[in-house]
């Protein structure tokens, strides 16, 4: 397996598991917080998708995120440049749209990511994202994306377990060690 296949398989795996884990959640499950200032599944799902959207825009040197070009910001009742990702408490108040909208954005970003990665070659992984920051390469950006996605997916799994002690990873999405 080469590096591009590994990156692609990692992103597909986390996407399939994420969509399968979130499919069918109720509004209460999306909005439930283990503690008053903790994140809920809806926010984490939005954050993961928004982050992936931004990282793929950077890596591909695209002009704008799907958040703007496809008008997803409107479905979240936001402006193109909001919400401010540095405003942690403001983000907690981000109004969550329906699960369908959340998953729709997630799927659209995944499809864009897959299309981009299918056209990347190994040499491009070592290319800097910008000339003034040589150490930040396309490969580093994609590695960070995979780590970020898996970390936050673990949070969603944990919250699902708190919500329902009989919940387990969807069949076929867990790790099988032989």
Question: Which residue ranges define each predicted feature?
Answer:
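N-terminal export signals and maturation junctions of secreted/periplasmic proteins
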Residues: 1-5
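Acidic/histidine-rich alpha-helical segments that form the ligand environment
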Residues: 78-125, 141-145
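Hydrophobic alpha-helical core bundles mediating ligand binding, dimerization, or RNAP-core interactions
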Residues: 11, 15, 22, 106, ...
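Short, contiguous alpha-helical
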Residues: 8-12, 16-19, 29-85, 128-178
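A structural signal for long alpha-helical coiled-coils and helix-turn connectors
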Residues: 22, 26, 118-121, 160
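Residues within well-ordered alpha-helical secondary structure of globular protein domains
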Residues: 24, 47-50, 108
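A general secondary-structure boundary signal
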Residues: 24-25, 110, 149-150
């Amino acid at each position: 397996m080469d590096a591009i296949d590994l990156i692609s398989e990692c992103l597909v795996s986390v996407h399939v598991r994420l969509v399968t884990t979130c499919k069918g959640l109720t509004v209460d499950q999306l909005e439930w917080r283990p503690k008053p200032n903790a994140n809920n599944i809806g926010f984490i799902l939005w954050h993961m998708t928004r982050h992936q959207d931004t990282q793929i825009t950077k890596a591909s040197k695209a002009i704008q995120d799907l958040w703007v070009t496809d008008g997803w910001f409107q479905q979240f009742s936001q402006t193109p440049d909001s919400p401010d990702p540095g405003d942690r408490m403001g983000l907690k108040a981000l109004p969550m749209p329906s699960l369908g909208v959340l998953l729709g954005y997630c799927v659209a970003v995944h499809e864009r990511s897959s299309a981009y990665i299918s056209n990347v070659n190994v040499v491009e992984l070592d290319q800097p994202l910008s000339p003034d920051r040589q150490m930040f390469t396309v490969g580093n950006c994609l590695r960070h994306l995979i780590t970020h996605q898996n970390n936050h997916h673990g949070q969603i799994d944990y919250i699902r377990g708190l919500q329902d002690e009989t919940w387990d990873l969807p069949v076929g999405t867990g790790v099988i060690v032989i």
